[in-house]
A protein has these predicted regions:
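Active-site-adjacent bridging/hinge elements
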Residues: 1, 133-140, 212-219
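Metal-dependent nuclease catalytic regions and adjoining charged, substrate-binding loops involved
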Residues: 39-43, 73, 152-155, 164-272
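Hydrophobic (often cysteine-bearing) scaffold residues that line and stabilize catalytic clefts
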Residues: 12, 16, 75, 79, ...
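Residue-level signal for well-ordered alpha-helical scaffold segments within enzymatic catalytic domains
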Residues: 22, 26, 81, 85, ...
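Short, solvent-exposed segments of well-ordered alpha helices
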Residues: 7, 11-14, 150-154, 231
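A non-catalytic, helix-rich entry segment at domain boundaries
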Residues: 23-106
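Nuclease catalytic cores
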Residues: 1-32, 107, 239-242
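Non-catalytic protein-protein interaction segments used by genome-maintenance enzymes to assemble
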Residues: 102-164, 168
Length: 272
């Protein structure tokens, strides 16, 4: 990240997630603007079909993918199905999007300082009211089976704590935690499970205190211009894209980087 290296090929899971989130954000906004369920869904599916028609052919058509590769589940047909089924599953969603003078609280960019030299930034999918209580809603898509093993990874979790803090600080909304809306993409079906991650004020205080220690450690690495490997994290979340580079001798890593990656500096402060 510091040097701006990114893979030359497409990140299938990232692209699928961007398309899925974008479609649901658009659906939420259309519903707020007065479109009926069917009108909003028709518009979203049409726009998604257009967005996934690239260079004269469908993006990741199922017939073009190796069915033995689990990533083949992240295909155009399954994307469309998952959008439609999610919208139908939550047609009468008890989690209602909160609305402010600026409109519906969906796809919210946040940026706030935590001291004089550090800022936290990112995006929230949605802020909702559920049973008269405010929550952040985070939508996930996965090929994993949805059960306790899957949802346990989000509590405790850095992202869930950050989203809770961001809602409370940047949007002055004292949320109780995060609702995780997960979509399982499988052969022939998409399945949805809703789970809750609750955060108490004491937990948030602890997370902020711990964050200060991690940032202090990062300062030390900057001063030494050396970032040690954390090789216990190399295989998490589908595996780090740099595993193949880090497994090489330090003396030859640059050559492998240049052949498989390209430099593309990312500025998280730029609103997408």
């Amino acid at each position: 990240m510091l040097e701006g290296w990114v893979g030359r090929g497409e990140s299938v899971h990232l692209e699928f997630g961007i398309l899925y989130h974008g479609a649901l954000e658009r659906f939420d906004r259309l519903r707020y603007d007065g479109a009926s369920h069917d009108e909003a869904l028709y518009t979203v599916i049409r726009e998604t079909l257009i967005a996934t028609w690239r260079e004269g052919r469908p993006w990741r058509a199922a017939k073009d993918l190796n069915p033995d590769d689990k990533a083949s589940l992240k295909c155009r047909e399954n994307l469309i199905r998952t959008i439609v089924w999610y919208a139908d599953k939550f047609r009468n969603d008890p989690a209602a999007t909160k609305v402010t003078a600026d409109g519906p609280m969906v796809e919210l960019h946040f940026l706030f300082e935590i001291d004089k030299i550090y800022s936290l930034c990112g995006y929230l999918d949605r802020i909702v009211t559920f049973q008269d209580q405010p929550f952040v809603m985070d939508r996930k898509s996965t090929t994993s089976t949805l059960g306790s093993y899957y949802f346990d990874q989000y509590d405790p979790d850095n992202q869930m704590s950050l989203y809770t803090v961001a809602s409370q600080v940047a949007f002055k909304t004292p949320v109780k935690g995060v609702i995780v809306d997960a979509a399982q993409i499988a052969v022939g079906f998409s399945r949805f499970v809703r789970s809750f991650v609750f955060k108490t004020p004491d937990q948030i205080d602890e997370w902020m205190r711990d964050l200060g220690y991690w940032l202090h450690q990062a300062e030390y690495f900057v001063e030494k211009n050396y970032w040690p490997q954390n090789d216990k994290s190399c295989h998490k979340y589908g595996g780090c894209v740099f595993r193949g580079i880090c497994s090489k001798s330090p003396s030859v890593r640059d050559k492998f980087l240049e052949s498989s990656f390209e430099r593309r500096l990312w500025n998280p402060l730029i609103i997408r």
